Amino acid sequence: MHPLELFKYCPKCGSSHFVVNNEKSKRCADCGFVYYFNSSAATVAFILNERNELLVCRRGKEPKKGTLDLSGGFIDMYETGEEGVAREVLEETGLKVEKAAYLFSLPNTYLYSGFLVHTLDQFFLCTVEDATHLEAMDDVADSFWMPLDKVNPEEFGLDSVREGVCLLYT
């Protein structure tokens, strides 16, 4: 099912005459409003400690519960990518990001509450203030440092994270 099929009413006037305009938008036949279905912005953090180990998390919730992941998540309104990745790292691990340097982005899909969300995942290389006080919080079941030679991209559950790990470490 195309994500636009789930939108039945115009978000501007509430009309049920909300019809497909093209493959990425719907148009209201009553008020003329055009809604474009765009990707949601998300972040992913590559964090290395002083032993050159990668910070890895285990997903505590679906999708892909129990698989490996990197810290990150959706960017809130009015946040920059750097602010979003710093907030997500703090919420999930308790670590405070000192610096976030943009690396690259990858498209992804993410099943959230039964709804397929298209995302644009922005990858950052982050440094943290103190890597010794690591916790697993929020939607993370576990977080730990993994030696780079033990990193196996196939153990990462989300497609974009797996691809990002491949780009950076293989």
Predicted regions and their residues:
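Conserved Nudix-box catalytic region and its N-terminal flanking loop in Nudix hydrolases
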Residues: N49-E91
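Short metal-coordination and nucleic-acid-contact micro-motifs, chiefly zinc-binding Cys/His arrays
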Residues: P3-F7, K24, A41
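Conserved small/polar residues in nucleotide/adenosyl-binding loops
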Residues: Y169-T170
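NUDIX/MutT-family hydrolases
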Residues: E135-V165
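Short functional micro-motifs and their immediate structural scaffolds
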Residues: F18-V19, Y36
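Conserved N-terminal beta-strand and adjoining loop/helix that marks the start
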Residues: D30-L54, F74
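Short cysteine-rich clusters marking metal-coordination/redox-active sites
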Residues: C10-C13, C28-C31
